[in-house]
């Protein structure tokens, strides 16, 4: 066929001897992409199926989380494509505001010694586009390596022209509907990057700090219940005293409730501030009095709103003390309710220097009661790396409550389903307590806010300046300046499912593929991305009846991939594994360089080096993409975090080898032979009928697992059938036929070999696409298939007529009998190749029939010299026995083993196990080890102890058996 992948040599007599993923994967992917197999089939009469990849940051490179989620998505897409659906899997990247701006700022600083301000806004943005052209494609190149069958011609970028138009359209419409407004509120402020940031970009770190107890004198001669003329407030941030506008006490607190409504004199500043009754003050905590600084603390901001307190901002955007405070009322309007004076000695101080100066002044005035050590959680910016400051700023907000109502109902009424279901509760708890969303960022890179200001400060919103002038009758003489801010990247990615299909145009793609079918995402962004997509999509997308349209019908949530000890993978821990290093392999030297080069904390390098050398003394072997994908699927138990396991990866690499070698065996016994394709009598052996029945049951179970997103079960079902039933049993069971079967029997077995292998390759294809396509290209001709690719072949369907119950039960019995013989060989240390005499005692009619019909079969596979049915009442000679259904298997021991030698050997084995059991029990009895060692290490020791005890018990049973001979 002209469309056969060029690297697959059709003239070779069979598959290469060894499975070499490095040689087959990349040429095959290039072939698939070139042939256009990843595109939708365009048949709109067929059901459509669509997944949008969560857009990774354009600055990023592929990590295990991406590999995990994309394996799941590609498995789903390939599975649905093979069922004939019109499938679209669309990819794209996110412009990643802060991350990208910082990458390019660092680049120009390192290469040119310049800042973005040296360039100016427009030139700096050009520089970013230039960088994107050179480096922005890294992650999509890596995605191709995973075998992702993405329609690359439809790849999108959140800043491309179509998406930028959609973003403006959404902003303008929401503003017209009063769902976007500008307001002065408290935000997470990064003083280094000088921008508002989202909660997701805040990293909370545990820290040892202090709690300062400060005295605030009561005004007008008031006294506490204990007769003191001051209140003591406890704070971890004394510098914010300068911005206090109240002191809260619990209204039920007997010590202070009579003081509610009175005032204190704020030290250092001298202003009178009220004492308020508010539940925020906890009677049991600290002194029971809480200073309220609405402009510098999120909780205080809420208290301030409840009591209409003014807000006093004492910090600049750099985090220094202002020379004059800004005073606002609860609505963010400037007010002169309080003086804006800040004592001269604090003006211009950096915030942490101000902290020391404020404490020193309190001490000097005799108002520092005490200082206690205190464990606290400090918010840091995950990119700037400095302490985040709650800051009162003018920002743009989305009024979310009306949008959230519809989005909650969509999940409540089942239009959107979460897998696993328990994540619905997380979604509800966030959505029912939703705050307005701050969507502006003080950056240059991003979607610039489509708002303009005249010289009087009036705001005009429109798609562009020309529209603003036209709609508001503003002549050329009116000077307008565009808002400097850009939109939060989550705003544009919130439109991802419909903007990427051409909205606001009513495109064919939008009609065909929206709503999309499923979104695969990590639970950490349910609120930041999933919930916002649901809110925005349902507001803008309506079906033909005007009903809000959901962005997707299913949300599949994944857990995190952790290291083998359950630790989160991070650069600072040095435990990150690059998925492509497991595909291609990496030397120890290169791995160490990757893990310890360019570290933010170089002092950790030695520890990381030791750990890496211990874990990967020879680096990482190449395993190929299919083995990686199989491992990821097998570990995907819904919604749970996964501890990565290199042993599993090796196991699935061995699985691919096993499938390759089994296929070579099939091809060697069928290529150039009569496989019954052209008629001729066919007789199916019991083994043929059994494997067809087993395979159909496998299809049924596998499809059920896939349809319920149980990729772990699907992978297990595939592994069990392929390795245990097909390779270990069926291929062995075909050998007697191949050696001495009639023409009709040979035809039947060859036909079955091809039929099952070809369908098995289709079944496995969604999870392991490369190896299955490669083998299928060899197998298809034997089945008379002329199609070009396995990707577009029909997915196997369950066929009840192929399930021969008698064949299943008969062969299961034969297997149990053979296993019984093999177990006796192993237990008695009898060589596997030594022919044995076997007898069946007390066989019922069913067992007798099975022996008589399949005697040569059983003898050949169990390597028996004879198989005898003992007459009723015949006890037979002294033997080792095993029970099977309806009979007892006897192997006479006379002459097979030297009793004394064997008992001596077993005694030594038992002694060895006793020593190991004693060692482990000693370790587990050591309280220090159990308390200090990681949980996973302790669990491994316990498992080892149980395994040793079980092995010892088996040896003791063997001793008893041999002693009785």
From Swiss-Prot:
EC number(s) per entry: 6.1.1.9
Which InterPro entries does its entry note?
A: aa-tRNA-synth_I_CS, aa-tRNA-synth_Ia, Anticodon_Ia_Val, M/V/L/I-tRNA-synth_anticd-bd, Rossmann-like_a/b/a_fold, tRNA-bd_arm, tRNAsynth_Ia_anticodon-bd, Val-tRNA_synth_C_sf
**Could you identify this protein by its name?**
Valine--tRNA ligase
Question: Where does the record place the region Disordered?
Answer: 1-22
**Any GO CC annotation of this UniProt entry:** cytosol
Organism from which the protein derives: Yersinia pestis
Protein role: Catalyzes the attachment of valine to tRNA(Val). As ValRS can inadvertently accommodate and process structurally similar amino acids such as threonine, to avoid such errors, it has a 'posttransfer' editing activity that hydrolyzes mischarged Thr-tRNA(Val) in a tRNA-dependent manner.
* Annotated motif 'KMSKS' region, positions: 568-572
The entry's ATP-binding residues are: 571
The beginning of the lineage is:
Bacteria, Pseudomonadati, Pseudomonadota, Gammaproteobacteria, Enterobacterales
Where does the record say this protein resides?
Cytoplasm
Which Pfam families does the record cross-reference, listed alphabetically?
Anticodon_1, tRNA-synt_1, Val_tRNA-synt_C
Query: Which GO terms of type biological process are on file?
Result: valyl-tRNA aminoacylation
């Amino acid at each position: 066929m002209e469309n056969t992948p060029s690297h697959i040599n059709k003239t070779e007599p069979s598959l290469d001897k060894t499975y070499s993923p490095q040689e087959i994967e990349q040429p095959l992917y290039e072939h698939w992409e070139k042939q256009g197999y990843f595109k939708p089939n365009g048949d709109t009469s067929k059901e459509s199926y669509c997944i949008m990849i969560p857009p990774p940051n354009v600055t990023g490179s592929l990590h295990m989380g991406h590999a995990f989620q994309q394996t799941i998505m590609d498995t789903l897409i390939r599975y649905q494509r093979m069922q004939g659906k019109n499938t679209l899997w669309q990819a794209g990247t996110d412009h990643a505001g802060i991350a990208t701006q910082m990458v390019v700022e660092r680049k120009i600083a390192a290469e040119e010694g310049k800042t973005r301000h040296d360039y100016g806004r427009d030139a700096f943005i050009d520089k970013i586009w230039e960088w994107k052209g050179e480096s922005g494609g890294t992650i999509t190149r890596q995605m191709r390596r995973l075998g992702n069958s993405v329609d690359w011609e439809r790849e999108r970028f959140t800043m491309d022209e179509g998406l930028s138009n959609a973003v403006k359209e959404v902003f303008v419409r929401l503003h017209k509907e009063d769902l976007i407004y500008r307001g002065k509120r408290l935000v997470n402020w990064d003083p280094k990057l000088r921008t508002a940031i989202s909660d997701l970009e805040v990293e909370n770190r545990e820290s040892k700090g202090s709690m300062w107890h400060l005295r605030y004198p009561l005004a007008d001669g008031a006294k506490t219940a204990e007769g003191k003329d001051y209140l003591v407030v406890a704070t971890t941030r004394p510098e914010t005293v300068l911005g206090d506008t109240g002191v809260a006490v619990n209204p039920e607190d007997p010590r202070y409730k009579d003081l509610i409504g009175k005032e204190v004199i704020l030290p250092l500043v001298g202003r009178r501030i009220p004492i308020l009754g508010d539940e925020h003050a906890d009677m049991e905590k600290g002194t029971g009095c809480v200073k309220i600084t609405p402009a510098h603390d999120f909780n205080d901001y809420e208290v301030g709103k409840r009591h209409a307190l003014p807000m006093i901002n004492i910090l600049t955007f750099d985090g220094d003390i202002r020379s004059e405070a800004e005073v606002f009322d609860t609505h963010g309007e400037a007010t002169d309710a309080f003086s804006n004076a800040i004592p001269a000695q604090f003006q211009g101080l950096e915030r942490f220097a101000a902290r020391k100066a404020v404490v020193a002044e309190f001490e000097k005035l005799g108002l520092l009661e005490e200082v206690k050590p205190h464990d606290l959680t400090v918010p840091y910016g995950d990119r700037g790396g400095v302490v985040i400051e709650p800051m009162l700023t003018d920002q743009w907000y989305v009024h979310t409550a009306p949008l959230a109502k519809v989005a909650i109902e969509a999940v409540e009424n089942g239009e959107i389903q979460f897998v696993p279901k328990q994540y619905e509760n997380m979604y509800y708890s966030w959505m029912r307590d939703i705050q307005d969303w701050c969507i502006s960022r003080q950056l240059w890179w991003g979607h610039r806010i489509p708002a303009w200001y005249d010289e009087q400060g009036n705001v005009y919103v429109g798609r562009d300046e020309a529209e603003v002038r036209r709609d508001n009758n503003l002549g050329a003489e009116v000077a307008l300046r565009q808002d400097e801010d850009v939109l939060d990247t989550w705003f544009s990615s919130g439109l991802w499912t419909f903007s990427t299909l051409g909205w606001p145009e009513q495109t064919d793609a939008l009609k065909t593929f929206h709503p999309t079918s499923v979104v695969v995402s990590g639970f950490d962004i349910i609120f930041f991305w999933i919930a916002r997509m649901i809110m925005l999509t349902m507001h803008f997308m309506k079906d033909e009846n005007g009903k809000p349209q959901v962005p997707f019908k299913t949300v599949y949530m994944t857990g995190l991939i952790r290291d083998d000890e359950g630790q989160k993978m991070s650069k600072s821990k040095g435990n990150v594994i690059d998925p492509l290093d497991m595909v291609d392999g990496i030397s120890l030297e290169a791995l160490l360089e990757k893990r310890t080069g360019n570290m933010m904390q170089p002092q950790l390098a030695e520890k990381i080096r030791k750990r890496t050398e211990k874990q990967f003394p020879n680096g990482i072997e190449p395993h190929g993409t299919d083995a990686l994908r199989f491992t990821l699927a097998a570990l995907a138990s819904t919604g749970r975090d996964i501890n990565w396991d290199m042993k599993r990866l090796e196991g699935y690499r061995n699985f691919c080898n096993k499938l390759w070698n089994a296929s070579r065996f099939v091809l060697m016994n069928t290529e150039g032979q009569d496989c019954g394709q052209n008629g001729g009598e066919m007789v199916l052996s019991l083994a043929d009928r059994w494997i067809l029945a087993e395979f159909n049951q496998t299809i049924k179970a596998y499809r059920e697992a896939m349809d319920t997103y149980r990729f772990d079960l699907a992978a297990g079902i595939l592994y069990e059938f392929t390795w245990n039933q097909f390779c270990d049993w069926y291929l062995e069971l075909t050998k007697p036929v191949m050696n001495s079967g009639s023409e009709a029997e040979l035809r039947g077995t060859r036909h079955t070999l091809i039929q099952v292998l070809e369908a098995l390759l289709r079944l496995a294809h969604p999870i392991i696409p490369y190896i299955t396509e490669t083998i299928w290209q060899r197998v298809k001709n034997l089945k008379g298939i002329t199609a070009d690719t396995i990707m577009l072949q029909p997915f196997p369907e369950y066929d009840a007529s192929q399930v021969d119950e008698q064949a299943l039960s008969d062969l299961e019995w034969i297997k149990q009998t053979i296993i019984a013989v093999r177990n006796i060989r192993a237990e008695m240390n009898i060589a596997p190749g030594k022919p044995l005499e076997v007898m069946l005692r007390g066989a019922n009619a069913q067992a007798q029939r099975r022996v008589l019909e399949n005697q040569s079969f059983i003898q050949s596979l169990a390597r028996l010299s004879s198989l005898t049915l003992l007459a009723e009442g015949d006890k037979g000679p002294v033997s080792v026995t095993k029970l099977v259904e309806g009979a007892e298997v006897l192997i006479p021991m006379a002459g097979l083993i030297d009793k004394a030698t064997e008992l001596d050997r077993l005694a030594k084995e038992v002694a060895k196990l006793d020593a190991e059991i004693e060692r482990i029990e000693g370790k587990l009895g050591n309280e220090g080890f159990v308390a200090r060692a990681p949980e996973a290490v302790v669990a491994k020791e316990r498992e080892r102890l149980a395994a040793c005890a079980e092995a010892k018990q088996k040896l003791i049973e063997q001793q008893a058996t041999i002693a009785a001979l």
